Amino acid sequence: MASIIKRKKNYSVIYNYVDENGETKQKWETWGTHKEALKRKAEIENQQHTGTFLPPSNQKISDFLYDFVSLYGEKKWGVSMYDSQNSLINNYINPIIGDMEVQAVTPRVVDGYIQTLQKTASVSTKTRKATTTYVSNQTIEKIIKLLRCAFKQAVRWEIIGRNPFDNVVLPKTEYKKRDIWDAEMIRTALDKCIDSKLYVAMNLSFACSLRMGEILGLTWDNVHISEDEIAADNAYVYIDKELTRASKRAIETLGEKDIYHIFTPLLPNTSTRIILKKPKTDSSIRKVWLPKTLAYILCEWKKAQDEIRNFLGDEYQDYNLV
């Protein structure tokens, strides 16, 4: 049961509850009008009667997100996702609403938070420079997606009764149409390229539609360009790795699962590492057929690499990368 007491111009709703330690506590909630207090009193009594009442919690959002990352993120995320999500938390969530109590977040609070984000300066990191003056709508969408997932866990953990980030009205995002190179422009770029390594990478990008991380992570054991395979139009590359940069913290926290190799940094005391890892999704693992022209380019590139390897001997750092 709950009761209402008038205190000067406000009204207090008073009720008892049992905390997580099994101890009975008393809670006072202040409301501006008698109507609001009556509504809250009825809500509490109904929840207590139906067994859906959640005891008050003063847990801060920053503390909750720490638990969320530890209990949820470390099981679900890879190293790249771990870094990006923690970056959003550290740069755009904790500095703005980190000190707010989880149970104090309402849909109206969320709308105000989005407005604040739109006026917040973008943050540059050690590995990525901000490209907009203020937080972009695309980044806001990522932040809300992260918080929606986090608060979904808060509901499951019985910290809150419903997710305030459901049905959020996001700012309209305008996606810029990317310029697409036509065949003539691609041919011009290849003709003017004088760097043999870049020339091979460009051909892989244009002919196979590979992403940069996939090109840099391609290893020779996944390149099938024997004479018989080329003659039968059966030359192909198998994409099952990608090269990316990850923080030492992410690697140490998540372990080396799905990481094939961690490259030794050129400079000491760096906070990140270049790694060779499994792609983010299984759908990214695929076989890509090679046109004969590109297959012959790769053959010549392999010969050039072998000559350098033979010349340098033991000094050649061989990671089997194309």
Q: Across the structure, where does each feature detected by a protein language model lie?
A:
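N-terminal core-binding DNA-recognition domain of tyrosine site-specific recombinases/integrases
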Residues: 3, 17, 33, 70-159, ...
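Conserved tyrosine-mediated DNA breakage-rejoining catalytic core shared by Y-recombinases
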Residues: 7-14, 184-185, 218-303
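Short, charged, surface-exposed hinge/linker loops at domain edges
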Residues: 54-71
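Short, structural beta-strand-to-alpha-helix junction motif
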Residues: 60-64, 101, 219
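Conserved hydrophobic/aromatic pocket- or pore-lining residues that grip, position, or stack substrates
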Residues: 65, 93, 110, 147-150, ...
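Basic, Lys/Arg- and aromatic-enriched nucleic-acid-binding interface segment
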Residues: 123-126, 130-137, 141-143, 156, ...
